[in-house]
């Protein structure tokens, strides 16, 4: 039960705790400053939220060390001062290190229930200096994955949420969520894929049987993502790392060069989704449990299981991918 006396403070606190990953942008003897960029929240977090649609939040926070046993939290949204609030405790946790950019550190901040300030101090000067764009190469995602060689059962792993129809799931155990997906074997990915793109089966299918129109929000993803590792900037597409794309249309091959990845049968003209397995609470480790090929005369063709492996992505990277996408947020995150 929240002890916040203002009705909007608790939704805001939950948003900061669950949907924001921060970079430290400044520090002094008595303060720390952090910045984050998060996609649109599934829940209203600001009093004006119902009045207009907000697709991303760029937030600056200055945490001033204790005054009368409370921290003072100064907050700016989109570069404009929003308000100051009190918080009895703030936990700072090193969450992720992006080694490809000099070991840049990302933090998770956990705030105890907020309290309103009766009188604000002077508005601070927030650091809104643009920071360089950061990203992770798609092939580097493999460094944060483990291969799954046997079925994952909800009774053991926790709840399972299917994401789209292309072999992607969110597996939640307690407060931890892992993205589980089929992806190309690493040796194949190194040889044939764009190194910027993580070659999940969802991405490969979108390339193979999708419409190839850059404006298609199904095949190339919607344009409301924020960048996974940026803490400033605008929203746009993220077909390199996100898992929200799924092919539109009839799933017949439009890129014939992709066909050998899915089957050795030259007569295959498309991919189809099987009827759901008997156990929806189990993720099977073979792609052929979910998909099959089809020939021009309607005959079923087995897919080549050896080219795709089932991977479990590290929960911290999974979380960063989820909070960068409003669709994944709605599917994978539970309102507290």
UniProtKB/Swiss-Prot annotation:
Interacts with cytoplasmic envelopment protein 3 and with the capsid. Belongs to the herpesviridae cytoplasmic envelopment protein 2 family. Its main location: virion. One of its GO terms (cellular component) is viral tegument. It is found in: Virion tegument; Host cytoplasm; Host nucleus. This is Cytoplasmic envelopment protein 2. Keywords: Host cytoplasm, Host nucleus, Late protein, Virion, Virion tegument. It comes from the Viruses. The lineage of its organism: Viruses, Duplodnaviria, Heunggongvirae, Peploviricota, Herviviricetes. Plays a critical role in cytoplasmic virus egress. Participates in the final step of tegumentation and envelope acquisition within the host cytoplasm by directly interacting with the capsid. Upon virion binding to target cell, a signaling cascade is triggered to disrupt the interaction with the capsid, thereby preparing capsid uncoating.
